[in-house]
Amino acid sequence: MNGDSRAAVVTSPPPTTAPHKERYFDRVDENNPEYLRERNMAPDLRQDFNMMEQKKRVSMILQSPAFCEELESMIQEQFKKGKNPTGLLALQQIADFMTTNVPNVYPAAPQGGMAALNMSLGMVTPVNDLRGSDSIAYDKGEKLLRCKLAAFYRLADLFGWSQLIYNHITTRVNSEQEHFLIVPFGLLYSEVTASSLVKINLQGDIVDRGSTNLGVNQAGFTLHSAIYAARPDVKCVVHIHTPAGAAVSAMKCGLLPISPEALSLGEVAYHDYHGILVDEEEKVLIQKNLGPKSKVLILRNHGLVSVGESVEEAFYYIHNLVVACEIQVRTLASAGGPDNLVLLNPEKYKAKSRSPGSPVGEGTGSPPKWQIGEQEFEALMRMLDNLGYRTGYPYRYPALREKSKKYSDVEVPASVTGYSFASDGDSGTCSPLRHSFQKQQREKTRWLNSGRGDEASEEGQNGSSPKSKTKWTKEDGHRTSTSAVPNLFVPLNTNPKEVQEMRNKIREQNLQDIKTAGPQSQVLCGVVMDRSLVQGELVTASKAIIEKEYQPHVIVSTTGPNPFTTLTDRELEEYRREVERKQKGSEENLDEAREQKEKSPPDQPAVPHPPPSTPIKLEEDLVPEPTTGDDSDAATFKPTLPDLSPDEPSEALGFPMLEKEEEAHRPPSPTEAPTEASPEPAPDPAPVAEEAAPSAVEEGAAADPGSDGSPGKSPSKKKKKFRTPSFLKKSKKKSDS
């Protein structure tokens, strides 16, 4: 080792600076006024602007001419109908037209066919496209059949049963007119809709072309027409070509009973197929090979055929036939030959054949009795609807059970509203109007499709035809309906006998109509209340206006009430003395008037006195001026006048003196005229004038009560001042009348 060598210094290159990573703020110019405006904007306002940007799609749809034309056609059709609920059907059609979005996550669907490609591209053509004039042209039964058959074509495409445009599925529309529905020749299974199906007759002539310009494959319909002509019970015929089915049709052993699906098919028929049916003899041979009972027909070296009394039953048999063929092909490939297979005994498995059963568990009612294939077909229709196909299938039984209410509506108050406010981008919600309409439609459809409780079940004897015997069975179980809990509002820990007794008492009160205002308050029960007005005897002129139930003490009287009932004995005694003093003063005045009359000349004619309504003139003409010696009497008489008031009449009307005065006050009747003309002296004018004078003085005093000391009146008038009681005036009026 060299001593001059020194420790080498290892130098490394300076670390290279990491490349600058562009950040968000590097792309933003902080001095940009647009950026400053957005930064200073309120969060709610910024969110509103973002929502407006998202809703531009709606404005684009509304401005498109195609949407306007479709909307106008819908509205015109609704105006022509006029019997549907206001706007409900039109709103539903508009919603169906606009909500064509497909969910991002699809349920698991069968692989194969063009439908898988369409779903991957996000394009799905609706099955039920009957709108406007198309929906009016068909009745309800034909609409449902069109939707079912079009959905069947979509299922065949999803399962991979289609072979371009050559397979056919047909259904019988009308037994009387022998009309059938078939797909237009040249249309793929993924393109079939309800309106595109063609209606033909038994000879293959087109009755209704549908919504396409395509024709019908006459040669392909020949097989279907032969089956329909031989089997009136058949409503649907399916003819498909699958690789597994073609392989089994080429085997000499045919379909082996090695799987439950093969045993569920029943008796399998075979026919040596020699190409397109053009001869009538070939049709007769097919009808003979199929027979009156078989549901499955295998065409040698060609394909598979299944028939059914409904679309659901035909689908059930063709599905099991395809599955059985696939099982057999794979089993033979692994086993090496049919000799190495274990075959099932059909006699043992016939009673245990796979048939759809009723669901077990708690439900709102008795479950429907499913026909063959209905339950499976309905489940697949639910899958298509979830994928966005809009099949229009009438479901017989809802998949989700509606929970029964545990409590009464009055116990649990409403806490939320039934309205949903969803944005346009949210496809998982719908408007409450559409939701309620769909719920009503589902309830109506479920009620229409529900079978009777004692429905007839058709079963054969010893494997014979199902039509040979009809057996009526009772409904399984009792119909249960959700009802309110008994004794819901009865308090806990109470004796049920007491509750029943109280209930019986309430019922008796309702029957006897014994209803009161309820219990009285005990707050003021010990307080004594002084009543100023005491109800006494009620005096009336008629008993008709008084209800005896509330006023038992009624006195009928033609005169007024007694005014002295409220006075004491002392007050009555003072009043009697005062009346006597007034009577003595009136007698003295009468004596003075007679003396003056005697002193007057006898040949002076008598002045006719006016009627009692003008007593003032009589007082001025006839009453002489009194002497000054009577001032003492006037002074003693004057203080007693204010005590007399018209509100306190006296009951002492029965004095004989007052009765004589009343007779003197009466006007002369016509019958007394001859007596007045007699030569006997008539001292009538003087007493009448003297009696009229006090009344005139009374009226003057009533008009001017403060004029006692006025200089215009003489002392004689003050002395003659006499106030007649009010009860005396009333008696005068009654006597005059």
From Swiss-Prot:
It is a peripheral membrane protein. The modification Phosphoserine is found at residues 12, 59, 64, 334, 353, 355, 358, 366, 408, 427, 431, 436, 464-465, 481, 586, 600, 613, 678, 707, 710, 714, 716, 726. It comes from the Eukaryota. Residues 687-714 have a biased composition (Low complexity). The modification Phosphothreonine is found at residues 331, 429, 445, 480, 614. CDD domains: Aldolase_II. GO terms for cellular component: adherens junction; cytoplasm; cytoskeleton; cytosol; F-actin capping protein complex; focal adhesion; nuclear body; nucleoplasm. It is found in: Cytoplasm, Cytoskeleton; Cell membrane. Residues 715-737 have a biased composition (Basic residues). Its main location: cytoplasm. SUPFAM superfamilies: AraD/HMP-PK domain-like (SSF53639). Residues 576-601 have a biased composition (Basic and acidic residues). InterPro entries: Aldolase-II_Adducin_sf, Aldolase_II/adducin_N, Aldolase_II/adducin_N_sf. Changing residue 445 to D: Abolishes phosphorylation by ROCK2. One of its GO terms (biological process) is cellular response to calcium ion. Residues 602-614 have a biased composition (Pro residues). Heterodimer of an alpha and a beta subunit or an alpha and a gamma subunit. This is Alpha-adducin. The gene is ADD1.
